[in-house]
Amino acid sequence: MLDNVLKIATRQSPLALWQAHYVKDALMATHPGLTVELVPMVTRGDVILDTPLAKVGGKGLFVKELEIALLEKRADIAVHSMKDVPVAFPDGLGLVTICEREDPRDAFVSNQYHSLDDLPAGSIVGTSSLRRQCQLAERRPDLIIRSLRGNVGTRLGKLDNGDYDAIILAVAGLKRLGLASRIRTALPPEVSLPAVGQGAIGIECRLDDARTHALLAPLNHPQTALRVTAERAMNTRLEGGCQVPIGSYAEIFNGEIWLRALVGAPDGSVMVRGERRGSPEQAEQMGISLAEELLENGARAILTAVYNGEAPA
């Protein structure tokens, strides 16, 4: 990095570019005189749109090319949606900053119906997230759930074209793109537990790049970082990936972290839930211990069955 230039690796989707510009603006406001440049790139996750992510390598497909750019020093930082960031990082790279979280809930989007409960039996709902699919199937087994890939605009276009009666998207993405008016209902965590890190923006960089770390430090949001730390610790212990429906959501009330999590069979037939409360200093340990509880209460059997291509008992 030149003394006054910082380069951001980002995907080219509208939402990814919004996030990159958000970080760029925050950096320039915090460090007058700093020049920030975007390095847009296409990832495999952006190209492979005809196959569920779970079958082609998971959400890590969205970050690999960005990480290569960091390692080759073509960029100084990479900006990610935290829900797309795998639990492990390549040697020499790490997550150094987590920005303040936007609304982490899932959004019910429909042109005809006001809520999930309003959908008639047999309605077609679009989502490619196994986490969303399993919770929908558990709550409304009478619905037809179909895969839906592509960026936010593409997904809304398919809804508007009549391919689906409703679709499920992230509230955060719709709000960031100025599309909050498309949200019919924001689904509470009790109905659709969010993905790990959903709504948060993470910044990855080289671990030995002290200057960049110092530039990024003011952008870190401690409460969001604690919440996401608890969620990711749980997911790391479960060795969770796109192939398994895993939800995890941490909130902070009165100085205490409340962490909820679930592991489910893709068809919603089996669901294991748990929760923990504790001090912020225990965020990582809470995530690990909650994962252990879920594993003992049936999640291990679900994970084993799904990874072996079997139906959970």
Swiss-Prot record:
So what family is this one in? Belongs to the HMBS family.
Q: In which pathway does it act?
A: Porphyrin-containing compound metabolism; protoporphyrin-IX biosynthesis; coproporphyrinogen-III from 5-aminolevulinate: step 2/4
GO BP terms in the entry: protoporphyrinogen IX biosynthetic process
Keywords for the protein's UniProt record, in alphabetical order: Porphyrin biosynthesis, Transferase
Q: How is the cofactor bound?
A: Binds 1 dipyrromethane group covalently.
Q: Name one GO molecular function term.
A: hydroxymethylbilane synthase activity
Q: What is this protein called?
A: Porphobilinogen deaminase
Record text on subunit structure and interactions:
Monomer.
Any keyword Transferase?
yes
Residues modified as S-(dipyrrolylmethanemethyl)cysteine: 242
Highest taxon, organism lineage = Bacteria
Species assigned in the record: Salmonella arizonae (strain ATCC BAA-731 / CDC346-86 / RSK2980)
Upper classification of the organism = Bacteria, Pseudomonadati, Pseudomonadota, Gammaproteobacteria, Enterobacterales
* Additional observations: The porphobilinogen subunits are added to the dipyrromethane group.
**One GO CC term on file:** cytoplasm
> Which cofactor(s) does the record list?
dipyrromethane
What are the EC numbers?
2.5.1.61
Physiological role:
Tetrapolymerization of the monopyrrole PBG into the hydroxymethylbilane pre-uroporphyrinogen in several discrete steps.
Give the enzyme's main class according to its UniProt record, as a single word.
transferase
Classification via HAMAP family: Porphobil_deam (MF_00260)
Q: Which reaction does it catalyse?
A: 4 porphobilinogen + H2O = hydroxymethylbilane + 4 NH4(+)
Gene name of the record: hemC
Known InterPro entries for this protein?
HemC, Porphobilin_deaminase_cofac_BS, Porphobilin_deaminase_N, Porphobilinogen_deaminase_C, Porphobilinogen_deaminase_C_sf
| Alphabetized Gene3D superfamilies for the sequence | Periplasmic binding protein-like II, Porphobilinogen deaminase, C-terminal domain
Which NCBIfam families did the record assign?
hemC
